[in-house]
Amino acid sequence: MELLCVLAAVAALFCGCAVLTLKCRVPASIAPLTALSAIVAVLTLAAMAGVLYPAAWLLYLLCLAGGVWVAASCRGSTGAAQRLFTPGSVLFWGMALAFTIYFFVRQPMATDFDELSLWATAVKITKVNDSLYATAELGTPWAATQNPGLPLLAYFFQFFGDYADWKIYVGYDILYFSVFAAVVGAVPREKWRVAVPMAAVLWCVPFFFTNYNHTIYLTTTYMTSYGDVPAGLVFGGAVAAWLALRQSSAPKWAVLPILALSANIKANTFVLALVAAGLVAVDEWLFADDGDFKAGLLPRTGFSVACFAAPMAIYYLWNVRYVGWLVSRSASDSGVGETSAPLSAVVVNGIKILLGQPVEGFYAEREAQFRTAMTDMGHQFWTSDGKLSMIGQGRNVVALIAIVFAVAILAAASRRLKARIAVIGALSGVCFLGYNLMLALSYGFIFKTFQAEQLTDYNRYIYSYYIGWFILALGCLSVALLPQITVKCEADGPTAVFAATRRQPRLAFELFVLVLACGMLFRQGQLILPQLSVLGFADSEFTDRRAERAEAELVCSYLDPDDRVFYVGQGDNGEGWFSAVFDFYPILVDYSGTVTTDPDTGETKMIGGGGELGLPELQPAEGVKNTYYHAFTAQELDDIVRGNGCTVLYIQTLDDIFVQSYADLFTDKLAAAQSGGTLLYRVTDAGFAPMPMEVSAQ
C-alpha cells in the first residue's frame, strides 16, 4: 500500500511534466526539475499561509486534471511520445521508478545525527501535522528556522499513506535525478554515445565529492536527508537547465522556479542561488539570441532582473519575514531568540577587516578567529591535509572542473558558444572566491569558537559549491557537444543572402566524456564497497535504529497523547535524546533541562537535551559522562521536571550516578527500573511512581 502511495506521487509528477512538455514547450528532460521546483514553491507559500494540506490536495488534483487534458488532446498523436521520452527524461523516469521500488523493498532508515536533530525530524513533523515544522509545538527551546524547501518536497511524496524514512530518500533522490536529466537535457537520441557516459558521470557526482577514504562503514550517499548535496545539485542544475533551454529555444521562464528552489534549501547556501541567478542573468543579457546586443535589450534586462527576483523573493519571505516572526515568538515564549550576529553586519565588518579598517566590539574580539579560519581554509585547499573528494584536496577539484570547462570551450563549434562557456567558467570561479569568503565570515563571526578552531563541517559546506560547479561545467560540456548551426547574412544589392552552416564537434571531445566516466567509476570502485553503499547495504546496518524505534513504539503505547516526557539517558551525548524526540513524536519529549538567559549580557545557557544527570559532587573526572555532565541537586531536578510540565520520565539508560543522586525522588527508589520491570515513571504529588508495562517486547 505504501508503495502505491509513493507511485501516486510519481504519477502526479508525470502528469505535471506532460503538461509542461506538450502544452508549455518545456523540454521533457527539464520538465521534472521545473515541476518539482514549482511544487515546492507552491507548498512553501501555502504552508506559510497555514493552508498546506488543502494546497497539497489542489496540486494533486491539478496534476490529475492536467494529465487528463493532455491525454484527451493528444489522443492519436504520433509525436507526443517522442517529445515526452528523450534521453534525459528516460534517465529520470527510469531511475525514479527503480529507486522508488528499491527503497520500498529495502526500507533504509534515518540514522545520522543531523537527520535526527533536524532534517528527518522536520519531515516527520510536517507530515504528522500537515503544517510547517517551524510552527509545531516541540520540547526543544529553540525555533526551527531551516528553509522548508526539502521537507516540503518530501511532504509531497509522503502525502498519501503513513510517514516513512525511506520516502524522504525517494523524494530527494528524485530531485537528484531531475538535475541529472537537466544536464543531458539538450542531448538528442542520436547522441546516445554522449548521453550514456554522461549519465554515468552524473551518478558518480554525489559519491565523488563527498567521500575521500576507503569505506569501512556504510556511506549514506543517496540515503540521506541532509541538504548539502541537494543544495549543490540544484545550484548547478539551474545553470545546466538554462543552457539546455536556450539550446532548445524553449520558454526561458522554466528556469525561474529552479532558481527559487535553490534559495529554499539551506539558509547558508542562499549565496549559491545568487551565483546561479547571476550566471543565468549574465548569459541572457550579454549574449542575445540573434547576436544583436541592442535588439531586445529591454526584455533581456527584465528577464535578468527576474532571475535575481526569484531567489530573493523566497529569501525575503522566509528568512527575513517568517523567520523574524518565529524568532520573536520563541523569545516571547521564554525560548531562544536571535542567537547569532546579523548577516549584514557580519559582511560589512568582515570586509572592513580585509581592507585593513578598524572594527569595534564583538567584531574586534573575533578578528583573530576570522583570520585563523581563512588561514585554515587555505591550508585545506592547498595541502594534502584537505581530503575533500576522491581526488584529494580542493586544488585538485578545481583543476578537474577547469579541465571540463576547457574541453567544453574547445569542443564548442561556434565562437559565440565558446565565449558563453568561457564567461560562465570565469564568473563561477570568481564566485567560488566569494563563497569561500562567506564561509570564513561564518566561522569568524557566526559559529562558536571551537567550531572555528576545528573547521567543523567544512567539507559539507564546501562540497556544495564543488558539486554545483562541476554540474554546471558538465552542462556546458553537454551543450558544447551538440551540433551548432551558424547563420551568416550577406547583402547582395537590394536582397540578402543567408547561409547556414552546421558544425559538428569532433569525436575526440565525445571520447573525453567516456574517459571521464570510466575514470570516475574506477575511482569510486576503489573507495566505495558495494555492500557499504546504497546499492548493496545489509539489513543489519539499521538494526540499532530498528531496536530504538521498536522501544519508542512500545513506550508510546503506554502514554497518553498529551503526555510530556522527561528523557533520562545516562551517558548520552545528545544523539539518544534527538532520537527519542524523533521516534516519540507526536508525543513530546521535553528538553529535559534548563534554559536561562543572563539579563546583563543576553547570553543564553542551555543545559539538557540528553547527557549525564547527577549531583555536582559525583561528576566523573573524564570521558563522555564528564563532557556532557548536567549537575543538579535532587530538588533542582524535581523542580525542572515539574516546572517544564513533564508528566512522565522515560528511563532509557540508568547508571549508579543517577540512582545515587535521585533515588529518593522515586516512590520505589528506582527498584522497578533497575530490575527491568519498567521504563516509565508517572509524575505524581507523592513522587515519581513506576508505571506497569511489559518490557519483554524490547
Regions found by a protein language model. Give the residues of each.
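Membrane-embedded, lumen/periplasm-facing catalytic core of multi-pass transferases
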Residues: L511-W577, A697-Q698
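Membrane-embedded, hydrophobic transmembrane alpha-helices
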Residues: M1-L84
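Perimembrane helix-loop-helix junctions
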Residues: G67, A71-R83, L272-F308, D590-T594
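Membrane-interface alpha helices of multi-pass inner-membrane proteins
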Residues: A41-A47, K252-A267, V271-G278
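Active-site lumenal/periplasmic loops and adjacent helix-entry segments of GT-C-fold
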Residues: A98-A199, T220
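Short periplasmic/luminal acceptor-recognition loop of GT-C membrane glycosyltransferases, typified by
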Residues: Q526-L527, A552-G610, I651-L654
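Membrane-lumen/periplasm interface segments of specific transmembrane helices
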Residues: R106-A110, L153-F156, W285-L286, L297-A408
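Hydrophobic/aromatic-rich transmembrane helices and adjacent perimembrane loops
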Residues: K124, D173, S225-F235, I265, ...
